[in-house]
C-alpha cells in the first residue's frame, strides 16, 4: 500500500474527514500538522502549490484536498491509488 502524507491544521473539519477516510481504508499515513508552523506550511505550499488544508499526497503524487480525495473514493479510484 502506498504511503500517504497529509498536511493538516488543528480544528479543521476537512482534515478530520480526510483522516477518517484514510483510517477507514486502512491506509498508512504521516500527518504533518502545519497550521501553526510557518516552515511546514511553506513546505506544503511549495509541494502542492496551495495554501489550504488539508493537502494530501499519495507517495509523491499530490491528489489535492479532502474534496478531491472524497471524489476519488466516489469514483472508485481511491483504492487503486492507495494500492500502488
Model segments located where?
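Local sequence-structure signature of Cys/Sec-based thiol-disulfide redox active-site neighborhoods
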Residues: 1-28
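Long, low-complexity, intrinsically disordered polar/charged segments
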Residues: 1-6, 58, 79-83
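Short alpha-helical
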Residues: 13, 39, 64
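Thioredoxin-like thiol-disulfide oxidoreductase module
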Residues: 34-51
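Structural micro-motif
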Residues: 48-58, 67
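Non-catalytic, surface beta->alpha helical segment in thiol-disulfide oxidoreductase systems
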Residues: 61-83
